Amino acid sequence: MRALLTSKWTKVAVFLLCLIPFGDLVWRIIKSDLGANPVEFLQHATGDWTLRFLVFTLCITPFRKLFKLPDLIRFRRMLGLFAFFYVCLHFITYLGPDQQFDLAGMWKDVAKRPFITVGFAGFVLLIPLAITSTAGWIRRLGGKRWQMLHRSIYFTAVFGVIHYYWLVKSDVRKPVFYGALVGILLLWRLGDWFFKRGSAVAVKLSPQRAPANSTQ
């Protein structure tokens, strides 16, 4: 398994798999196969894939620990950047075909429509995460500060779920499903943090062992 995860070709294969949804959308645009409301179709498709890639990204840490596959970490940055790629497409379909690049109209929407406000907040939160995803930024910020910044991906995922839930008016099964996944991952993360914190406190409070008697 380790040989498979560390192979450069596995990373290439994962990259190509991540591009399949984009390729499908491009093909549908070329064939004019976007349904009765093309803009709505594109917005929903890109929004769905944004949430999916956020969930994929959040799954990396628990999976690598639960299944003892540390090399899974090689794919986390790629999956996170694909989440950013699809949210950018989501935003472009809103700003372009929907709003006709009317920035004033967009800001009115952001201010007046709660589901857009929350979605826009999630998009903005992802921008610094994408920018600082490189090893150079880890060195500049320092490991701890970088980790604290990148934990905001959980807020992005929560905002994305709320955005989706408020958007749909009748069938809420998909946003509830995504919400359940994000909730489970967040609870796991909190549990892992409390466990580590408790272990660290226990080590500090434990009595030091007496030094061995060198005369014996």
Briefly describe each language-model feature range.
Residues M1-Q216:
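Membrane-embedded alpha-helical bundles that constitute the cytochrome b-like, heme-associated redox core
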